[in-house]
From Swiss-Prot:
Residues binding S-adenosyl-L-methionine, per UniProt: 183, 211, 216, 232, 292
Superkingdom in the source lineage: Bacteria
Enzyme active site: 317 (nucleophile), 351 (proton acceptor)
Molecular functions (GO terms): rRNA binding; tRNA (uracil(54)-C5)-methyltransferase activity, S-adenosyl methionine-dependent; tRNA binding
GO BP: tRNA methylation
Source taxonomy: Bacteria, Pseudomonadati, Pseudomonadota, Gammaproteobacteria, Pseudomonadales
Similarity annotation: Belongs to the class I-like SAM-binding methyltransferase superfamily. RNA M5U methyltransferase family. TrmA subfamily.
Disulfide bonding pattern of the chain: none
Stated role: Dual-specificity methyltransferase that catalyzes the formation of 5-methyluridine at position 54 (m5U54) in all tRNAs, and that of position 341 (m5U341) in tmRNA (transfer-mRNA).
Identification of the protein by name: tRNA/tmRNA (uracil-C(5))-methyltransferase
Enzyme Commission code: 2.1.1.-, 2.1.1.35
């Protein structure tokens, strides 16, 4: 593909128009638009391996044809580090039966801070020959390597990468574990964090955060409020978030492993939860709620939960479900800020954000 700036501008304008049209029924202000680098923006990549001509090649498949591989030699949308590592890793497995035997998938995870991890997935047990070859490879490439085989995992180095992002004049450090969700476009993620930081503003009350992940938004937003109650259901993400809070000396956040639906029940005093033992929900003075839900958006009950807060800061990876949730809240809240974040250039996907305030 060609990375033409005019083509990119036209595609981005199409996304702006789509978001504008979806939010028009709610009298939304004009969205602030945060663009992306045209290439080398994607910090993670996953490839299947395909045998052809007696060699294994990086391969991907189109959405329309899962049978015919597209052989990949370079991947311009991926970070420069991934593009540097791809030929080095390929040369290594071509030279080593211990590395290449029954290797079927490769995953790269990198950061703006320069960290990198490679996951190698196999249809066989990992033996001492693999361990020796992979240990040398990790040293040669300056990366952590994780071997996966039939539910087992071997870690050479660390099982996370470290990202550093500047938000509100402060640098935050993030552990991003292997296998956990991370924002793929680091440059746009940093813009998104700064927008959310500015939109929330300095407050003297408390924040409720649903779907906090590894603490991507939690860390900077916690510096804007008295204290935060954050929820997440993934164990891996919860552990990463706790590490990130400690690493950044953010001590006003309580993290609970509850779903949004369970938290709704807890706040409505439907039933008690052991995981809330020792946490006095009545001690919180919530003025704002921050939500970053999955593509399906908020379920109706969670949407109703957010209605009780004066400010709803909402980051969405699906503008259609965002619009549906806003429609449910529109009688009590209005959109006061709106933004489009081009996390996924050269695709129809977009990330968007709104600040809803009580009428």
């Amino acid at each position: 593909m060609t990375f033409d700036s005019q083509a990119y501008a036209a595609q981005l304008e199409d996304k702006v128009t789509r978001l504008r049209d979806l939010l028009a029924p709610f009298d939304a202000p004009e969205p602030t638009v945060f663009d992306s680098p045209l290439q080398n923006f994607r910090l993670r990549a996953e490839f299947r391996l395909w045998r052809e001509g007696g060699e294994r090649h990086y391969a991907m498949f189109s959405q329309d044809d899962k049978r015919t591989p597209i052989l990949i030699e370079e991947f311009p949308i991926a970070s420069l580090r991934i593009n540097q590592l791809m030929p080095q890793l390929k040369a290594a497995w071509q030279a080593s039966a211990a590395l290449s035997h029954k290797l079927f998938q490769v995953e790269f995870l990198t950061t703006l801070a320069g960290d990198a991890m490679i996951t190698l997935c196999y249809h066989r047990p990992l033996d001492e020959h693999w361990h020796a070859a992979a240990t040398k490879l990790a040293t040669d490439l300056g990366v952590s390597i994780i071997g996966r085989s039939k539910g087992k995992r071997e870690v050479l180095g660390l099982d996370y990468v470290v990202e550093k992002l500047d938000v509100g004049g402060r640098t935050f450090s993030y552990r991003q574990p292997e296998g956990a969700f991370t924002q793929p476009n680091g440059t746009v993620n940093q813009k998104m964090l700064n927008w959310a930081y500015e939109a929330l503003g300095d407050r003297s009350d408390d924040l409720l955060e649903l779907y906090c992940g590894n603490g991507n938004f939690t860390l900077p937003l916690a510096t804007r409020v008295r204290k935060v109650l954050a929820t997440e259901i993934s164990k891996t993400s919860v552990n990463a978030a706790l590490s990130n809070l400690a690493e950044n000396a953010v001590d006003n956040v309580t993290l609970v492993r509850l779903s949004a639906e369970e938290l709704t029940e807890a706040l409505n005093e439907v039933r008690p939860f052991r995981r809330l033992h020792g946490i006095d929900l009545k001690s919180y003075e919530f003025g704002s709620v921050f939500v970053d839900p999955p593509r399906a958006g908020m379920d109706p009950d969670t949407c109703e939960l957010t209605r009780r807060f004066d400010n709803i800061l909402y980051i969405s990876c699906n503008p259609e479900t965002l619009a549906a949730n806003i429609a449910q809240l529109h009688d009590t809240h209005r959109i006061t800020r709106c933004a489009l974040f081009d996390q996924f250039p050269w695709t129809h996907h977009m990330e968007s954000g709104v600040l809803l305030t009580r009428r």
